[in-house]
Amino acid sequence: MASSFKNAGLDVGVLDDATGNMYTAGGSVTAVVHAVYISNLSSTNSAKVNVKVTIDGGSTFRHVGRSLEVPANNTLVLDKPINLEPSDILRVYADPNPDSSSVDVEAYASILEIS
């Protein structure tokens, strides 16, 4: 078994679709997401973010965190491991701001791939 560390990053949007896919495990790879860092770059607006993973190789999503509050100029860290099976997806997206302003959020994950 070979293992390697990977980094994944994303400019977080507001759509719960493939544009929010931060990482997808390869077809013959299992992965351990060691931590997810979600940074709100806005100096005025808080952000609410959602973190989801698939449980069946890419089609059925379950929330790891839902409407997680990230205050302005702050970072939220999900520091417990998330295990992904082959073809599973890690998705991060934000709820739209109530005042219709755009969200200014970035996400980063540290991942161990095992093949």
Question: PLM features: residue spans?
Answer:
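C-terminal interaction-tip segments
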Residues: M1-A31, A35, A94-S115
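Short beta-strand elements bearing conserved aromatic residues within extracellular beta-rich modules
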Residues: V49-V51, A107
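Intrinsically disordered, low-complexity Pro/Gly/Ser/Thr-rich segments with frequent PxxP/GP/PP motifs
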Residues: G57-I89, D95
